[in-house]
């Protein structure tokens, strides 16, 4: 019999299907293996033992995959708020900690909230209700929720965020763009790889936009006389790697954010594709889920349902048409 994905101890229980999941364990049947439901209307658990785990085991699993020394100097990955010796009831994964994601963790009965972006970059001088960060900290403490962040250490880890992006767009022969070793751990910033076959630049950028759900992809005017095959990329804010991408002969460089002046001077070098910070990291949650599922299959893991992108897009086609006419 496969292990069910929740942490509890049961000696012998019989209950009706949906009510059992909801009332005894606090979540729906999607995390209960099919074999436990094959008797139909009734579920019987006989002498079933499922071990409990502490929150520190969740943190340890993430850090085995993405060691904290791999994070950048400015970063604050790791424990943000809460206790680690408490038993883990479940983990909610999100890109950003907001008041809504804290509330969702409470609703789902999860006392672990794992974010990609740290809630705390700088120290707090007080915890009140003055700012959203303070309110998130307060609500997490009140509800016994531990907040943990896996940020640039997850970006820089082998098989991490940038490798997941490369996988999604079909790159082969992927390696770190700027490899390094920190405290004995190997990692790197960005990745570079090759497409199975060359693609027309704008067709490639359109394909990437579709994969990542990008409404407005920004790009430069790159070399029009050649197709793209060698691709460098960095999720999030990656313009610091643009020079390295040029040096390594990339045909295109993809990232989430890029400063205005970086768009200049590369018309003969390579194409630039800027997806948006949030959009470039959209597959980070599935990566974290896979890491935890492999290391801790008993842990209930949920992906946050509320989008946390703070940027809104106002589409004004009449202004776009006017601008295009003025440029002619």
Q: What role is predicted for each listed range?
A:
Residues 44-328:
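Hydrophobic structural segments
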């Amino acid at each position: 019999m496969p292990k069910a994905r929740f942490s509890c101890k049961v000696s012998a229980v019989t209950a009706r299907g949906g009510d059992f999941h909801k009332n005894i364990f606090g979540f729906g049947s999607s995390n209960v293996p099919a074999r436990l439901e094959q008797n139909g209307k009734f579920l019987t658990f006989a002498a079933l033992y499922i071990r409990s785990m502490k929150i520190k085991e969740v943190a340890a699993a993430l850090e085995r995959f993405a060691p904290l020394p791999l994070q950048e100097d400015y970063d604050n990955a790791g424990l943000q708020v809460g206790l680690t010796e408490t038993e883990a009831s479940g983990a909610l994964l999100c890109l950003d900690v907001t008041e809504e994601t804290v509330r969702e963790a409470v609703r789902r009965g999860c006392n672990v909230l794992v974010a990609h972006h740290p809630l705390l970059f700088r120290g707090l001088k007080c915890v009140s209700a003055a700012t959203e960060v303070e309110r998130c900290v307060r609500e997490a403490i009140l509800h016994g929720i531990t907040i943990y962040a896996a940020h640039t250490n997850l970006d820089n880890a082998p098989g991490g965020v940038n490798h997941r992006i490369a996988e999604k767009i079909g790159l082969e022969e992927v390696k770190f763009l700027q490899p390094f070793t920190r405290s004995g751990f190997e990692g790197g910033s960005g990745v570079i790889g090759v497409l199975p076959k060359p693609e027309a630049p704008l067709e490639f950028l359109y394909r990437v936009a579709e994969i990542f759900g990008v409404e407005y992809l920004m790009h430069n005017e790159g070399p029009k006389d050649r197709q793209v095959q060698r691709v460098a990329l960095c999720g999030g804010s990656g313009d610091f790697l643009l020079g390295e991408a040029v040096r390594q002969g990339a045909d295109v460089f993809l990232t989430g954010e890029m400063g205005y002046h970086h768009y200049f001077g590369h018309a003969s070098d390579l194409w630039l594709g800027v997806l948006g910070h949030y959009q470039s990291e959209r597959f980070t949650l599935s990566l974290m889920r896979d890491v935890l599922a492999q290391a801790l299959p008993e842990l209930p893991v949920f992906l946050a349902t509320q989008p946390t992108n703070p940027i809104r897009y106002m589409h004004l086609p009449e202004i776009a048409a006017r601008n295009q006419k003025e440029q002619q």
